[in-house]
């Protein structure tokens, strides 16, 4: 293609690999790939390459895996590729200003939210957690701040009542490459129009933790149901019964008012396990005891009915 760019790609997980795959079929010239060092994984703690490294090596691309881009000798790895632009997608390393300034057109990032909403580490999960009606991807020019650069292109998608972080991740992994290819075309032909982020509209997507995912029955049923979807597939909402963690995969909201204390089991039937919350009733539909597969409430009651006696309270 006449407006082909020399591109350095930097990314690590599957989400990033999908963007690299799109670049490789776009007609641009990917001159090098940066990804995180191989990490121990699995029971044997065997060193495993990132999905981006696997794809890059399949395609015969040069792969670089520095632990940091702060040392000058590692920055030379970038400079020596003489790229027009560096595309960064879930890379996991900070790019110093010297690196940001190296490519002719700078560095651009694909971020999984409609900036300036949800800057930070967990934008997909936080959009669900907060009950947002939509989310999307933003392609932005990178600067030294955390997701603070000028916006180049946005694509939105609705959040449905059935979406989990897993399903939303897949939606954005389809949208992101579309936005990226469009943005690169605009950069190549000089039609990109950077837009500053409105600082008054900024929200921050804090990292998730396993402790945050513990169900707090004082919250409303609607909030808890959103948390269950937001924390799926990681870290998974959970409750504790008899000292054992039990993951919750699916629940529904019953708007009925209840005078019972939050955490009180109101009913346990094949239709679900109904628990009082700070507002409304949460109906648990699919659960996973430690060491077991996820199962319906009915199947769990068949083996552990003593866990869910109406009138008892869950911690």
From Swiss-Prot:
Residues at which (6S)-5,6,7,8-tetrahydrofolate binds: 113-116
Ligase recorded as keyword: no
EC number: 2.1.2.9
Keywords: Protein biosynthesis, Transferase
Classification via InterPro entries: Fmt, Formyl_trans_C, Formyl_trans_C_sf, Formyl_transf_N, Formyl_transf_N_sf, Formyl_transferase-like_C_sf, GART_AS, Met-tRNA-FMT_C
Biological process, per Gene Ontology: conversion of methionyl-tRNA to N-formyl-methionyl-tRNA
Enzyme class (EC, first level): transferase
Signal peptide (UniProt feature, chain positions): none
Protein's UniProt name: Methionyl-tRNA formyltransferase
UniProt source species: Salmonella typhimurium (strain LT2 / SGSC1412 / ATCC 700720)
Gene behind this protein: fmt
